[in-house]
Amino acid sequence: MEMASAFTLNVRLDNIAIITIDVPGEKMNTLKAEFASQVRAIIKQLRENKELRGVVFISAKPDNFIAGADINMIGNCKTAQEAEVLARQGQQLMAEIHALPVPVIAAIHGACLGGGLELALACHGRVCTDDAKTVLGLPEVQLGLLPGSGGTQRLPRLIGVSTALEMILTGKQLRAKQALKLGLVDDVVPQSILLEAAVELAKQDRPSSRPLPVRERILAGPLGRALLFKMVGKKTEHKTQGNYPATERILEVVETGLAQGTSSGYDAEARAFGELAMTPQSQALRNIFFASTEVKKDPGSDAPPAPLNSVGILGGGLMGGGIAYVTACKAGLPVRIKDINPQGINHALKYSWDQLEGKVRRRHLKASERDKQLALISGTTDYCGFAHRDLIIEAVFENLELKQQMVAEVEQNCATHTIFASNTSSLPIGDIAAHAARPEQVIGLHFFSPVEKMPLVEIIPHASTSAQTIATTVKLAKKQGKTPIVVRDKAGFYVNRILAPYINEAIRMLTEGERIEHIDAALVKFGFPVGPIQLLDEVGIDTGTKIIPVLEAAYGERFSAPANVVSSILNDDRKGRKNGRGFYLYGQKGRKSKKQVDPAIYPLIGAQGQGRLSAPQVAERCVMLMLNEAVRCLDEQVIRSVRDGDIGAVFGIGFPPFLGGPFRYIDSLGAGEVVAIMQRLATQYGSRFTPCERLVEMSKRGESFWKTTATDLQ
């Protein structure tokens, strides 16, 4: 039986051909290699039609044009040559579209990304809708690749080299108005008239290319180009620390096309695409993509979720305000905030106002939309308006008695079906639910700060939590735009438990004489977004270290922090960025002065700050403890799978994505190598480095955590 076509042709009475893109059985249009023959058959018909006046590509999907190429095609390639052939086929198809003798217009609504934008770039003109769903970008770099179907050559010529480089190197997505301003699209229209606007453009002569701004024309010349690529190269190297080979190849390929012409540029693009597809970095980044897609589809339990119509939040502090924002503005649910202090409610409301007003200023949101979203949030100092809330998120102080009191009050003032979700970072959920009348409706829902930016949430059922409560909480997290992992109710849960030994070791090296900036730079070089000591300053030294005694009580000496260091720092009123002084000193708010290490820290903790370890040695000590603890978490079923463990570390603490997460990284090194490193470190620095039993056993048997296919677990 022949596969239904993803591309269908309809020639209108006015001799404008409409090519409708609709991949059968899929929510998103993605380009697959087998579609090439369908498009070529259509191109043949178009060339034979002598009456043809123009062509329009449009999607039948409600919220996407083309979301990119099917990534599985790359995974099926066994060699760089095979991946290069794939790129050349894409380039050839786009060239055939571009070579049509009549105007070809892309009518874009929704996501137009990767191969989708490359198809649109191959057209002679582009019209898109003014809808918030409409975004245009080339995100291949986020998978360790570059655009392989002509994007590196067409985009710089259309919008200018410096703007194109910013898009390709970062994977940045543009909204409709931004795309129009830069010349990426020719018109922005309401969705209701998208097709007709594209048809009108197709009836005109081919749109002439917009003259580039003077600055872009200078930068495209030999002298300007040399300066631009040198400057962008240095900036990119600083940002990536040399860990992402795709960025270097993007610069090389774009420059080749500008200096030697498009033919050389296309050759370089296809060759680089093939080579990058085989790099371990790209394989790891693609694995993370597949894993996160799977997690987003995971319902959390077998039970159907309960309806979610409205949410309550207890506490209007930083976390409460952030949770209210994602609940109202991402999930679109009415939110009622309760705080004992009216100022707390005002703080939470201002938090959402600031976020939304920023979007209005950047023209990402209309003022009317801002007001509509803000109207979903209300506040109270008692339980007025809480009677019919489906789920209450508690975000009060980390105090067990207080949280137990919140459970009792919610059970007294809310409906019998209401779920109580605690945003605790350290207290056992079973203890919070200890006196609950309906313990099956109590669960942990651990957000990370800042709530609107951090993609991960941990969902923590205790022994009596019902399957429906789990499913409903997972459903809410997804509505809020989060990636949820379900973890076991053990001290520290997963993320904080693997983070604590990593930070402890950094502080221990500080007491041994390593410099603050050296430790942080070593872990940034390894691939973390910030170093461990800066992270502690950002989180708040008082907040970040609160969990250490909890973990030490639960798991023993391996979690003990260096004696008296934390207390000495806190006694000196150092809380980190929030009060302007921690390990670093921070300039006054609003000023652009950089943070700088406070040399007074060293005598305060009895350290010299001389240093003798290399950057790789510093990183090794911190990271090995994190890996060991992640394996223990898997062994104790704190996490349900290595997939959740990798996603939790990458999305929760910024574990280097190009390494694929702790379990992928262990597999890449080999369990035997990890055990050997840890045994060496245990001999040098103490028993906290003793490899856990599972790692030792896997080392003996030559086992790995992941199977060879991208999405299968062992």
Curated annotation (Swiss-Prot):
Alphabetical GO biological process terms: fatty acid beta-oxidation
Region annotation 3-hydroxyacyl-CoA dehydrogenase: where it falls in the sequence: 306-714
Keyword Membrane assigned: no
InterPro entries for the chain: 3-OHacyl-CoA_DH_CS, 3-OHacyl-CoA_DH_NAD-bd, 3HC_DH_C, 6-PGluconate_DH-like_C_sf, ClpP/crotonase-like_dom_sf, Enoyl-CoA_hydra/iso, FA_oxidation_alpha_subunit, FadJ
PROSITE patterns, per the entry: 3HCDH (PS00067)
Pfam entry (one): 3HCDH_N
Localization per record: Cytoplasm
Any Gene Ontology CC annotation: cytoplasm
Keyword Lyase: yes
EC number(s) reported in the record: 4.2.1.17, 5.1.2.3, 1.1.1.35
Catalytic activity of the protein: a (3S)-3-hydroxyacyl-CoA = a (2E)-enoyl-CoA + H2O; a 4-saturated-(3S)-3-hydroxyacyl-CoA = a (3E)-enoyl-CoA + H2O; a (3S)-3-hydroxyacyl-CoA + NAD(+) = a 3-oxoacyl-CoA + NADH + H(+); (3S)-3-hydroxybutanoyl-CoA = (3R)-3-hydroxybutanoyl-CoA
Pathway as given in its UniProt record: Lipid metabolism; fatty acid beta-oxidation
Annotated site residues (Important for catalytic activity) in this chain: 118, 140
Keyword annotations of the record: Cytoplasm, Fatty acid metabolism, Isomerase, Lipid degradation, Lipid metabolism, Lyase, Multifunctional enzyme, NAD, Oxidoreductase
Biological function: Catalyzes the formation of a hydroxyacyl-CoA by addition of water on enoyl-CoA. Also exhibits 3-hydroxyacyl-CoA epimerase and 3-hydroxyacyl-CoA dehydrogenase activities.
Family label: In the N-terminal section; belongs to the enoyl-CoA hydratase/isomerase family. In the central section; belongs to the 3-hydroxyacyl-CoA dehydrogenase family.
Complex formation: Heterotetramer of two alpha chains (FadJ) and two beta chains (FadI).
Annotated protein name in UniProt: Fatty acid oxidation complex subunit alpha
Source species of the chain: Escherichia coli O7:K1 (strain IAI39 / ExPEC)
